[in-house]
């Protein structure tokens, strides 16, 4: 019995260590190499297949300097205003999320920063549990320790979901506006950013009043968005 208990404890610990070693190796690789596809992309494409949707993956890597500053500012203004200064976690946002989750009795809000969102996109799935959030935090800490802010943001810009099968700034710019990501205007960047929290909902409701309102809010906040210091775009 004692041996069985030891195995029951050792097995999940071993899996955790192995997975994080695998993740860390990939984080090191992604400092210089673009991901072929992310875990979230694979999960989504499998989901679409199971739903009987005829969706092809549209994912086009674009270097950081060739993505519009307008889009960078819009995303920071909307998703993570403190991105340039924090170490991967917005503790005020996390505390607010914990309160909302406690009040609802479910894991709904995450207080996720851009770095945390990237950790999820690269390596995890869309499930909402405290275990998954813990793994997300561990990956975020590893990534922030060995990857500069520009690269984290570059990976994020290229992995965001914007429509059915459409991932990354370049694919989204071509899909919605038939232009490269480098040429996005402030209005276009704000509208793309407004889709980020619920891309598939807005894909099905493109004329949503909520989308228009969110676009206007992003436009107002863009002027105060702070990019990473090394960004000379």
Swiss-Prot record:
- Primary localization: membrane
Q: What does this protein do?
A: Peptidoglycan polymerase that catalyzes glycan chain elongation from lipid-linked precursors.
Going by the UniProt record, its keywords in alphabetical order are:
Cell inner membrane, Cell membrane, Cell shape, Cell wall biogenesis/degradation, Glycosyltransferase, Membrane, Peptidoglycan synthesis, Transferase, Transmembrane, Transmembrane helix
Q: Does the keyword Membrane apply?
A: yes
Family recorded in the similarity comment: Belongs to the glycosyltransferase 51 family.
Name its pathway.
Answer: Cell wall biogenesis; peptidoglycan biosynthesis
Q: What is this protein called?
A: Biosynthetic peptidoglycan transglycosylase
Record-level GO cellular component terms:
peptidoglycan-based cell wall; plasma membrane
